[in-house]
Amino acid sequence: MANISSIHILFLVFITSGIAVMATDFTLRNNCPTTVWAGTLAGQGPKLGDGGFELTPGASRQLTAPAGWSGRFWARTGCNFDASGNGRCVTGDCGGLRCNGGGVPPVTLAEFTLVGDGGKDFYDVSLVDGYNVKLGIRPSGGSGDCKYAGCVSDLNAACPDMLKVMDQNNVVACKSACERFNTDQYCCRGANDKPETCPPTDYSRIFKNACPDAYSYAYDDETSTFTCTGANYEITFCP
């Protein structure tokens, strides 16, 4: 065990070198009237919550991520798993109860990069992969802009017919134009791989008008990326 002097020296090293070791708590809450299954995927850092778990109506679960973590969260709907966690979901499927990758589009995403440039957290709600449920991100205890980010409109109700995903005569998700048409124009690739050559489309404007604070397409950064320093975050499905 380290003695008091060595602990004091270690503390001074962290302070004088400007290193802040902080963990961030995420609280995932289900306000939907039906059960959802949260999915998690890390781009950098450890897998959180074993990759996925069930949230009954009104339930919540807290996950803790280290500084430097990046990744995404989403809700899966219409899932059916056996005792071993094998099965599938109608929306947001990721290979089992504990996700083996990202959710199959269309799916609403909460995206984070913790302690990025300037020590800030970067976060957003993205509809780039389409939409399945309402979603909100609320920071707490941080400093800086720390604004609420979310898509709180029912895009399934406003989804154009050609983008609808149906299950048993119900609209369960709304595809992005990129997912539906798979062209450079809608996917911002090839000759359209820059903001100057990939402007908003009629389809992305439908998403943006419904959810002004969410990413509606790949280059929708200006009004859709939010920052906060030293915060914890509540991610609510169906806020």
Swiss-Prot record:
Q: According to the UniProt record, which cysteines are disulfide-bonded?
A: C32-C238, C79-C89, C94-C99, C146-C228, C151-C211, C159-C174, C178-C187, C188-C198
Keywords from the named record = Apoplast, Disulfide bond, Pathogenesis-related protein, Plant defense, Secreted, Signal
Specify the inducers: By 2,6-dichloroisonicotinic acid (INA) and salicylic acid (possibly an endogenous signal for acquired resistance). Strongly induced by pathogen infection.
**What are the protein's GO molecular function terms?**
mRNA binding
Primary location:
secreted
Reported function: Partially responsible for acquired pathogen resistance.
Descriptive protein name: Pathogenesis-related protein 5
Taxonomy of origin reads:
Eukaryota, Viridiplantae, Streptophyta, Embryophyta, Tracheophyta
